[in-house]
Amino acid sequence: MSPALFLCQRCKEPLKLLQQQGGPLEVQHHANTPTEIPVSAESQVRTSGRPHSDGGRVSQGSALCTFTLLTSGGPDSEGGTTSQGNACCTFTLLGESASMRTMNTIQNTVLETFEILSDQKVVDHPLCVDCTDHLLMQLDDQLALLASDNQKYKSFQDRELLVSEEEREALHAELCAELSSLEQEEARLTQELEDLDGHHARVAAELRAAQAESKELYKQHEQHRVEYSVFKMEQLELMDQLSSVENQLTYALSQQYRLRQTNIFNATFTISDEGPLGVINNFRLGCLPGVRVGWTEISSAWGQTVLLLFSLSKIAGLQFQRYQLVPFGDHSYLKSLTGDGVLPLFSDGSHSVFLNNKFDCGMKAFLDCLQQFVEEIERDERCPCLPYRIHVKEGLMEDVWDSGECCSIRTHLNTEEEWSRALKFMLSDLKLILAWASLRFSRVQRP
């Protein structure tokens, strides 16, 4: 048969049960000696129809285990059995192994269960030795506390017996007055507490309102921060654009200042008369037997010369008589104002040097326009004195500063040296006129 298993109701440790010869199962204890619990006559009648041979004890065949409650009572003198007044209790095993389930054990189990459920039997819970010691310590502490309270009550009672009736009444009146004062203080404190509760409620409401306002302000702050970031980005972009515009303005002002300091005629037209041939904008005007120049370059040089005189007349406000200058690159020409004739200032070399050709007429007409411009600028006192005089009818350029030599500008019955020298004299006069016009008209136009 397998022994029954019980657990301590406090620490849940298993309790070891010992089965003795001729007696019930007992629990091992260290503090007190366990006693056998007899079954009453009523129980004996319920459990079995015949008396037991051991003088009223439960036989070993019954499947009931007895436990002794640890109290101050000792074992009874009659055969080691415990009297009915002892605080012992029988514990019933509900559900044992199949080998112990006989009709007798089943009947006893049912009866014990009925007594437990009908409150006819007090059920105590088994404890191990350590838990029992702990329980006893707690009970000792409670007993000491109760003894202290009992001593205080006894001392108070003894003191009350020594007090006279008058002193008791005076003390009662004093205590009543103190009680009344304390009741008033309690009422005042109660009112103050109610006021504080009301104030607390108002403060709580204000706090909730402040928290709601704080949340709203935080949302607004976040929204404003996002808007600030957007505006800050736009500001940075605008600052970049402004910086770019300022840089462009600074560059434009510097360019404007440089352009104002730059003379347009000097920057556009460059005339050189130091060599054997006159040169304008790197185009040679004329040719020599030892220096052959193509007619395309000569025509381009004439185009630059026409453009120079045309520009000077425009800025001076001069309207030419008899001819109109038409700058057209290497195919520039003069248009007659009295007729429909056109006098070219370009040639491909096919014109006859023995006849009065249009190319020669065009060069004479150009000298006529140049003479008109010279007469216009001579009205200014600061006009330079030109080194070469123009004879329009003859088509001659006279050197008045040096030898007084006259050179014809025509190719008809003329040599290349004399023709080239006449062209060089003409460019020399234009160079001086260009320098005068650069100073004269630049001061007028500059703010």
From Swiss-Prot:
Expression by tissue, per the entry, reads: Expressed in brain, skeletal muscle, placenta, thymus and uterus. Expressed at a lower level in liver, testis, stomach, and 17-day-old embryos.
Localisation per UniProt entry: Cytoplasm
Signal peptide (residue range):
none
Keyword annotations: Autophagy, Coiled coil, Cytoplasm
Q: Which GO terms describe its molecular function?
A: protein-containing complex binding
Q: Where is this region: Required for homodimer formation?
A: 186-256
GO process annotations (BP): autophagy; endosome to lysosome transport; G protein-coupled receptor catabolic process; glucose homeostasis
| Classification via InterPro entries | Atg6/Beclin, Atg6/Beclin_C_sf, Atg6/beclin_CC, Atg6_BARA
Record GO cellular component, one term: cytoplasm
Phenotype upon knockout is: Decreased embryonic viability: embryonic and postnatal survival rates of homozygous mutant mice are markedly lower. Heterozygous knockout mice show defects in autophagy, increased levels of Cnr1 receptor, elevated food intake, and obesity and insulin resistance.
Point out the coiled-coil segments of this chain. Answer: 169-228
Q: How does it assemble?
A: Homodimer (via coiled-coil domain). Interacts (via coiled-coil domain) with ATG14 (via coiled-coil domain); this interaction is tighter than BECN2 self-association. Interacts with AMBRA1, UVRAG and PIK3C3/VPS34; these interactions are not disrupted by starvation. Does not interact with RUBCN. Interacts (via N-terminus) with GPRASP1/GASP1; the interaction is direct.
What family does the Swiss-Prot or TrEMBL record give for this protein?
Belongs to the beclin family.
Write out the function statement from the record.
Involved in 2 distinct lysosomal degradation pathways: acts as a regulator of autophagy and as a regulator of G-protein coupled receptors turnover. Regulates degradation in lysosomes of a variety of G-protein coupled receptors via its interaction with GPRASP1/GASP1.
Task: Supply the name of the protein.
Answer: Beclin-2
Query: Can you name the source organism?
Result: Mus musculus (Mouse)
Q: Which gene encodes it?
A: Becn2
